[in-house]
Amino acid sequence: MGGEVPEPRRLNRALSFDDWVPDEALHLVMGHVEDPRDREAASRVCRRWHRIDALTRKHVTVAFCYAARPARLRERFPRLESLSLKGKPRAAMYGLIPDDWGAYAAPWIDELAAPLECLKALHLRRMTVTDADIAALVRARGHMLQELKLDKCIGFSTDALRLVARSCRSLRTLFLEECHITDKGGEWLHELAVNNSVLVTLNFYMTELKVAPADLELLAKNCKSLISLKMSECDLSDLISFFQTANALQDFAGGAFYEVGELTKYEKVKFPPRLCFLGLTYMGTNEMPVIFPFSMKLKKLDLQYTFLTTEDHCQIIAKCPNLLILEVRNVIGDRGLEVVGDTCKKLRRLRIERGDDDPGLQEEQGGVSQLGLTAVAVGCRELEYIAAYVSDITNGALESIGTFCKNLYDFRLVLLDRERQVTDLPLDNGVCALLRNCTKLRRFALYLRPGGLSDDGLSYIGQYSGNIQYMLLGNVGESDHGLIRFAVGCTNLQKLELRSCCFSERALSLAVLQMPSLRYIWVQGYRASQTGLDLLLMARPFWNIEFTPPSPESFNHMTEDGEPCVDSHAQVLAYYSLAGRRSDCPQWVIPLHPA
């Protein structure tokens, strides 16, 4: 016995996890796996798991509409209940992508609306959607559609909305924020109020749609479950009856104070008792008291479209200690941010948008600098999201954010060019410290000024951004060498946007080849050639390259070393696609592919 050598342990496939777990159990387990990355990993275990993932997947997000074929999606996930689809590059939001660029919803709706019999929710973002597309969707899915989100879309009219309102009686969410909609009358809202009794969320914020306050009141009477309304401009004094009726309302944005300074006109405005998310338009100093009675209850406050001064911001925010989300313009100033740091200890999201470019106003009100950001970092240590336009910034402020804001998953900073001199450039050490310490970061954007980040700083971003999946960089680096050093470290980066950088087409191509997880890159403003031939160095299977040439005027301008100057017109879009080259490129976009 003592001299016997035990047999080596062998894995018996008959006893493997895959074989003894029945399909029913795997269906249940898969039903609780929601993270798409976990889903993808599970589907690769074996064919059986792949099949069960296909049958149990409830939601899919297609991050770029040209990355997949609608027919393949239908075959792969026949029981989808929810689909999100993104179209044009983010630059479309800033006027850098023309309307006729593409991203048409028609192929997706025509292919999927009828066959996906379980589809209850559709979210389209930055896409061209026509009345005919919406009509096709309503014909196929109107009887069971619960959620329709058209986010920053173009191409449709209120005729289509009227059809949705009349036919989709199970609709719980209708989202139209920042859509360009042809207004053919407000009947759509009346139809919605008459035909729907289950609506929870209605959003037509930042559109130019005109509606009748009486229809909003009727909607509130018939939809007792209405929790969120974000609307276009409408005088707040005309919404008094609506607010009295909408007792369940928790989230309101829009309306307007059309007669700023009229002390008595808005005295009777009383918000519903459960309201805790608020954004008001054109509010001035005299209208602030309308918020004070329930300011302690506010969890979200949006002051981006108000006429408030820095002092007004200080006064309001001091009364809102329970804020989780704050959205303002940079008129809040460093003083306002100091109040935020002292008061809003629970704050999770802070957005500081660009304000008025009038230098006189900025001198009077201040603007945001390293002082304000440092105060927020020290005082609001639960922050998960910061997006800020700043007039000045230092390495020390970025280090403070890295030291105190350990929960950050999304950080975006834009350094404005209105100041002649910035205190502390380059920002290499500050960026390095922020990335090293904020290990939960998944999204990172840094738009600076020339000289804002050296090649060393760019390499730090690559070295310490191992978990970041999306990145936007502008005016960073000094040479092609810096870009290559950056790319070597970006092992998990999936989406990259570059603007106003000094890189050549060859360097861009070599950088792409260094990033193994990259699925999408968009570049605007670089040292472009007239043909884009060096971009073919990044060519590989399933990789589409689309090139917008530089303007002829800029192409004739060369740097001292004979290289093309940075051209703001030239663009590159490259992405993985299982659908092949797209067939709807406009004439001014040139698809590049090896001969």
Curated annotation (Swiss-Prot):
GO terms for biological process: defense response to insect; regulation of jasmonic acid mediated signaling pathway; SCF-dependent proteasomal ubiquitin-dependent protein catabolic process. Expressed in roots, shoots, leaf sheaths and leaf blades. This is Coronatine-insensitive protein homolog 1a. Keywords: Jasmonic acid signaling pathway, Plant defense, Stress response, Ubl conjugation pathway. Gene3D superfamilies: 1.20.1280.50, Ribonuclease Inhibitor (3.80.10.10). Induction: By the leaffolder Cnaphalocrocis medinalis infestation and methyl jasmonate (MeJA) treatment. It comes from the Eukaryota. Residues 20-62 form the F-box domain. Interacts with TIFY6A/JAZ3, TIFY6B/JAZ4 and TIFY11D/JAZ12 in a coronatine-dependent manner. Interacts with TIFY9/JAZ5, TIFY10A/JAZ6, TIFY10B/JAZ7 and TIFY11C/JAZ11 in a coronatine-dependent manner. Interacts with TIFY11A/JAZ9 in a coronatine-dependent manner. Jasmonate binds at residues 90, 351, 389, 412, 499. SUPFAM superfamilies: F-box domain, RNI-like. SMART domains: LRR_CC (SM00367). Plants silencing COI1A and COI1B show increased plant height and seed length, are hypersensitive to gibberellin, and display reduced sensitivity to inhibition of seedling growth by jasmonate. Plants silencing COI1A show early and reduced tillering with few grain filling, and display increased sensitivity to the chewing insect Cnaphalocrocis medinalis. One of its GO terms (cellular component) is SCF ubiquitin ligase complex. Involved in jasmonate (JA) signaling. Required for jasmonate signaling in plant defense responses. Can complement Arabidopsis coi1-1 mutant and restore jasmonate signaling. Required for JA-regulated defense responses to infestation by the leaffolder Cnaphalocrocis medinalis. May act on an initial response of jasmonate-regulated gene expression toward drought tolerance as part of a BHLH148-TIFY11D/JAZ12-COI1A complex. Component of SCF(COI1) E3 ubiquitin ligase complexes, which may mediate the ubiquitination and subsequent proteasomal degradation of target proteins, including TIFY/JAZ family.
